[in-house]
Structures are given as C-alpha cells and as structure tokens.
Amino acid sequence: MSTEGAKPSEMLIAACRSNNVDMLEEVVHQQEGDGVSFINNARDSLGNDCVHVCTKYGSLECLDWLLDISGVNLNNRCRMTGDTPLHFAVMFIKKDQETALRMVEMLMEVGADPLLTNNDGFRPIDLVPGDFHDVFASALEGPAPALQYSADVVADDDDEEEGSGESDEE
C-alpha cells in the first residue's frame, strides 16, 4: 500500500488496517505534541478511530501497541452504528474466532466497557453467535461490569452502628 502524499492521520489508519506496527510507531513519533490526541482523533472515511480499525481488521499487533498507551480511548462509538471497539472485536468472530477472542481479552484487560450498547441497543455479548456465547461471555466479564454497581455501594464510616463488625459486648 502506497502512503506517498497521504496525510499523517491517513497513514495512521492505514497502519492500523494493515497491522503495520513499524509504520504506526513512525507516524505517531513524528507528531508534535500529544500523540494520544492524534491517535484518538484520527478517523477513517467511515468515522472509525484507530482502535476500531484494528478490531475491524484483526490487527492484533497494532491493537496491542495502541493499548499500551495511556489515554487511548477504548469506548469511542462508531459514528454510523454506535459500535465500540468491543462490538467490532466480537463481530470479527465471523472471520477468525481466535483473533476475535484475543482482541476481546486485550480490550477487557485495559478497561473497555462491555455494557455499552450500539445504536440498535446491542451490547457486544448480544452479537456473539450461540455456538461461541459461553467462551465470549466469560471473556466479557471483568472489572468493567462491576463499575455499574459502584455507585450503589455506600460506605459505613460509623463504627458505633450495628453491623459494623465491632461489638461492645464481651
């Protein structure tokens, strides 16, 4: 693929699409200022960011490289469908189950939210074909689902109250 005359953002997307880590690194390191903003703001012609493109094309090495960068947005939504990178990773099962599962695991390890729905109201797990549901369901469980309940947890700082674990009785 020729990148001659291409804009840096186009080269970045091309690197993600073709799983070319060397090109990805080179383009990001050539940018002045905040590389994270450059990565998060680059889009393909359909409005997909770098993480979306990696998961759409099964670009494991580029995805791994991007996920090592603090601040890369894991939960951006595709402008057309509302799909997150986790949705794209799950849909990759049609091409390669092993790669799809690995991408889901990678995204979950760094905090992608499996509870986000796309424009049709589907979570990533809802898009998994029945034959693979159990395998992907366990991969999509992780620290992120617990976050939805964290607001329901109430701290009890009053050690005098019943149920505090301390007792005046002996």
UniProtKB/Swiss-Prot annotation:
PROSITE patterns: ANK_REP_REGION (PS50297), ANK_REPEAT (PS50088)
Broad class of the protein's primary localization: cytoplasm
CC per GO annotation: cytoplasm; cytosol; nucleus
Comp. bias intervals (Acidic residues): 154-170
Localization per record: Cytoplasm; Nucleus
The keyword Repeat is annotated on this UniProt entry: yes
UniProt keyword annotations, A-Z: ANK repeat, Cytoplasm, Nucleus, Repeat
GO molecular function terms noted in the UniProt entry: myosin I binding; protein sequestering activity
Top-level taxon in the UniProt lineage: Eukaryota
Residue spans crossing the bilayer: none
Region: Disordered, residue numbers: 150-170
Start-end of each ANK repeat: 46-76, 81-116
GO annotation (BP), single: endocytosis
Gene3D superfamilies: Ankyrin repeat-containing domain
Pfam families recorded: Ank_2
Keyword Ligase appears in the UniProt entry: no
Protein name, UniProt field: Ankyrin repeat-containing protein C105.02c
Source organism: Schizosaccharomyces pombe (strain 972 / ATCC 24843) (Fission yeast)
Source organism phylogeny: Eukaryota, Fungi, Dikarya, Ascomycota, Taphrinomycotina
